[in-house]
């Protein structure tokens, strides 16, 4: 099993040290090709790594603020794009066709049912004009939409709004997220990588540069329905357990999928926490 080989190479040499120190969270700064690999999906022969430890990926910006925030009930700004779109821009190397996302509206409705202080914007209401100025008012910004990494030009990688507009990584760096704890990109492709893997943390870096403490993104295209299950579990845990860190809530949500019929790492391991989820 490749995941077990990588565990033996990366974790086994320090496993006893982690146990002796009673480590609860692995703060991970992957380099080059290791950025392709979700640490959660490594296996010790009995358990997945995420079943033993929380995982927090970091960028250089993460190192400037690793303080833990006081626990409080979250406020969420949630936007979703459920419609199919074709994106064409002069500065993009090609056009991109996106299928409908059948489960995202249900995902947002479930989040709002658990966290009443949630503002929901769907399709034509989910525009940059309606969304970007409001983000700084919320602790969590959640986008259930398509994203695309543009190979060779990662600064033009983008997420799709519900009216067909896009926000590139450059645009994200100008967002005002100083009071935002977490930006969740619950989308089909928000952290796909190429080359040395520099793009994967480029997203987290852009979100943090704009002021947010952390981001959650995905390493590969994820099934729409399993994403809904994981994300609603994540928010339920955060809402019902205010003492949970972001890293712990994501860990428990991933474990819930491990214990379900969607237990293959394809479904739960690509979700990465980038930044400060402590």
Which positions does each model-derived feature cover?
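An often Trp-containing, charged/polar helix-loop segment at the C-terminal end
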Residues: 226-278
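Active-site-proximal beta-strand/loop segments in catalytic clefts of secreted hydrolases
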Residues: 29-32, 53, 79-83, 124-125, ...
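Short acidic loop-to-helix transition motifs that present clustered carboxylates
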Residues: 122-130, 166-167
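Second-shell loop/turn segments in exported
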Residues: 1, 94-101, 121, 190-193
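Short helix-loop-beta junction
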Residues: 102-119, 206-215
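Charged, well-ordered internal alpha-helical segments
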Residues: 1-77, 103-114, 126-147, 155-156
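Catalytic cores of nucleophile-dependent amide-cleaving enzymes
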Residues: 139-229, 233
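Short glycine-rich His-centered loop
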Residues: 72-100
């Amino acid at each position: 099993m490749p995941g077990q080989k990588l565990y033996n190479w990366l974790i086994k040499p320090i496993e006893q040290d982690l146990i002796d120190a009673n480590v609860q969270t692995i703060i991970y700064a992957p380099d080059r090709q290791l950025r392709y690999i979700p640490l959660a999906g490594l296996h010790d022969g009995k358990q997945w790594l995420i079943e033993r430890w929380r995982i927090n990926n970091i960028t250089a910006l993460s190192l400037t603020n690793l303080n833990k925030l006081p626990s409080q009930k979250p406020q969420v700004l949630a936007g979703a794009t459920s419609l199919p779109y074709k994106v064409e821009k002069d500065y993009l190397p090609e056009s991109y066709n996106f299928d409908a996302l059948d489960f995202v509206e249900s995902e947002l409705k479930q989040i709002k049912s658990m966290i009443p202080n949630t503002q929901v914007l769907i399709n034509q209401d989910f525009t940059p004009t309606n969304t970007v100025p409001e983000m700084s008012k919320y602790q969590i910004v959640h986008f259930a939409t398509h994203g695309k990494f543009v190979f060779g030009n990662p600064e033009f990688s983008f997420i799709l709004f519900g009216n067909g507009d896009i926000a590139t990584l450059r645009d994200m760096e100008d967002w005002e997220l100083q009071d935002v704890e977490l930006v969740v990109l619950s989308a089909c492709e928000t952290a796909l990588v190429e080359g040395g893997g520099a793009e994967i943390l480029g997203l987290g870096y852009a979100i943090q540069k704009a002021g947010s403490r952390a981001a959650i993104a995905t390493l590969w295209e994820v099934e729409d329905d399993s994403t809904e299950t994981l994300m609603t579990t994540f928010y339920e845990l955060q809402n019902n357990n205010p003492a949970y860190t972001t890293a712990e809530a994501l860990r428990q949500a991933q474990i819930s999928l491990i214990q379900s019929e969607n237990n293959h790492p394809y479904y739960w391991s690509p979700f990465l926490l980038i930044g400060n989820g402590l």
